[in-house]
């Protein structure tokens, strides 16, 4: 992939957009995209989680198929596959994000989501009334609506690799015209969760097969090194990464 076709891996790993601007709205009414999605969920997707089976870790639990296509394209644009290491999609990041949103994190279990809501300062952090799962749903709807309006009627996942990069940079800069939430709010949480999934223990769905840890030389969840001290004294410590599941 050329530098002009997408966002380069080093751009992400250096932390583009890591300092998110505080965002806020002054209404607690459900955005149209969220209200529509909630009306279609009968029963709610979280009410009866699907039974786990052999390939349950590869199943989208929260995103609808169109939403999954968009989030997959977003992750692929943020961290494309190259000769340095696996891309975000190859590493399972879309599944990581989806499974996080399907659980307590998505519901905002540890977030204070009561009003009043007002425009905050950068130091005050997240100021929206939406938990992460709802923020993603509304953000994806706004993103695709903006792309359809400004990109010849195409959703984000239908754009070329180069056009996706341009759209994502506009999103990061807050230049994308969202109607329900601030564009930067969606970009900030997307980037944060993408990086978390890329470097997480594989037990959570991302960093598939420890490939990202191997790329950066991280040994994994090893609890002690006493038996290796003499073996590797004055030598480079090179071992295959071990995940939580590998050691359980």
Regions found by a protein language model. Give the residues of each.
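Substrate-recognition/specificity elements adjacent to catalytic centers across diverse enzyme folds
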Residues: 77
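N-terminal secretory signal peptides and thylakoid transit peptides that target proteins
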Residues: 3-20
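C-terminal segment of N-terminal export signals and the immediately downstream linker at the start
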Residues: 5-7, 26-73
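A generic structural motif
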Residues: 80-81
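Mature-region segments of soluble proteins
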Residues: 2-5, 55-57, 66-73, 84-248
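Intrinsically disordered, low-complexity glycine/proline-rich and charged
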Residues: 18-28
């Amino acid at each position: 992939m050329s530098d002009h076709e997408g966002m380069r891996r080093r751009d992400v790993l250096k932390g583009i957009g890591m300092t998110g601007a505080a965002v806020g709205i002054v209404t607690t009414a459900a955005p149209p995209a969220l209200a529509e999605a909630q009306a279609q969920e009968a029963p709610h997707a979280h009410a009866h989680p699907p039974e786990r089976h052999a390939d349950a870790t590869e199943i989208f639990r929260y995103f609808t198929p169109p939403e999954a296509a968009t989030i997959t394209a977003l992750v692929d644009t943020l961290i494309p596959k190259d000769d340095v290491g696996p891309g975000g999609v190859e590493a399972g990041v879309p599944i990581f994000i989806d499974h996080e949103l399907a659980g307590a994190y998505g519901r905002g279990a540890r977030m204070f989501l009561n009003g009043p809501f007002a425009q905050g300062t950068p130091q005050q952090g997240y100021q929206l009334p939406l938990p992460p799962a709802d923020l993603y749903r509304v953000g994806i709807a706004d993103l695709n609506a903006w792309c359809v309006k400004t990109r010849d009627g195409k959703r984000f996942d239908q754009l070329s690799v180069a056009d996706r990069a341009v759209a994502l940079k506009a999103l990061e800069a807050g230049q994308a015209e969202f109607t329900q939430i601030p564009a930067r709010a969606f970009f900030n949480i997307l980037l944060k969760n993408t990086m978390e999934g890329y470097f997480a223990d594989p037990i959570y769905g991302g960093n598939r097969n420890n490939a990202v840890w191997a790329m950066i030389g991280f040994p994994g969840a090893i609890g002690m090194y006493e038996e290796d001290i003499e073996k590797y004294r004055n030598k480079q410590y090179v071992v295959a990464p071990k995940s939580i599941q590998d050691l359980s």
